[in-house]
């Protein structure tokens, strides 16, 4: 075979374009033709951490006032009928109840962390109440 002289050709600047797969082409064309955009979602745990920071900063009561007041009156009915409550008495009960629950959940969280978990479970609450001596 005889040798031939090679002439220099102009470079096109890279590789030749490849054919796209059918799925990729369909995915790229879908939003352009009016596909429905997904609503924005935060990663799991982000909103939870934001809520923790928000509620730790705040001082307002978290249990609604009227449902708590109805519960207090319902429990009081079992002991004596026709009891009246000052609004400040119901507020004091609510403050005490919320403080108790916050402390309970703090200790419950510590029990879950001790068990190398991040999720609190009923057994954590039971352990806390046994350690505190509230329930034998």
UniProtKB/Swiss-Prot annotation:
The entry sums up its family as follows: Belongs to the histone H3 family.
Segments carrying the region annotation (Disordered) are 1-43
Q: Its principal location? A: nucleus
Alphabetical UniProt keywords: Acetylation, ADP-ribosylation, Chromosome, Citrullination, DNA-binding, Hydroxylation, Methylation, Nucleosome core, Nucleus, Phosphoprotein, Ubl conjugation
Organism (species):
Homo sapiens
Q: How is it modified after translation?
A: Acetylation is generally linked to gene activation. Acetylation on Lys-10 (H3K9ac) impairs methylation at Arg-9 (H3R8me2s). Acetylation on Lys-19 (H3K18ac) and Lys-24 (H3K24ac) favors methylation at Arg-18 (H3R17me). Acetylation at Lys-123 (H3K122ac) by EP300/p300 plays a central role in chromatin structure: localizes at the surface of the histone octamer and stimulates transcription, possibly by promoting nucleosome instability.
> PTM Citrulline: at which residues?
3, 9, 18, 27
- The superkingdom of the source organism is Eukaryota
Residue positions, PTM 5-glutamyl dopamine: 6
Asked if the keyword Zinc-finger belongs to this entry, the reply reads no
Tell me the residues on which Phosphothreonine occurs: 4, 7, 12, 81, 108
In-chain residues carrying the UniProt-annotated modification Symmetric dimethylarginine: 9
Which residues get modified to ADP-ribosylserine? 11, 29
Q: What is this protein called?
A: Histone H3-7
């Amino acid at each position: 075979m005889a040798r031939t002289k090679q002439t220099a050709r102009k470079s096109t600047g890279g590789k030749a374009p490849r054919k796209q797969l059918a799925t990729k082409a369909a995915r790229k064309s879908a939003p352009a033709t009016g596909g429905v955009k997904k609503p924005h979602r935060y990663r799991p745990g982000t909103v939870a951490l934001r809520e923790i920071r928000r509620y730790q900063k705040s001082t307002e009561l978290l249990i609604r006032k009227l449902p708590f007041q109805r519960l207090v009156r319902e429990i009081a009915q079992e002991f004596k009928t026709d009891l009246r409550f000052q609004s400040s008495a119901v507020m004091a009960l609510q403050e005490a109840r919320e403080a108790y629950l916050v402390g309970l959940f703090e200790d419950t969280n510590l029990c879950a962390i001790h068990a190398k978990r991040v999720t609190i479970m009923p057994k954590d609450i039971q352990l806390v109440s046994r350690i505190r001596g509230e329930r034998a």
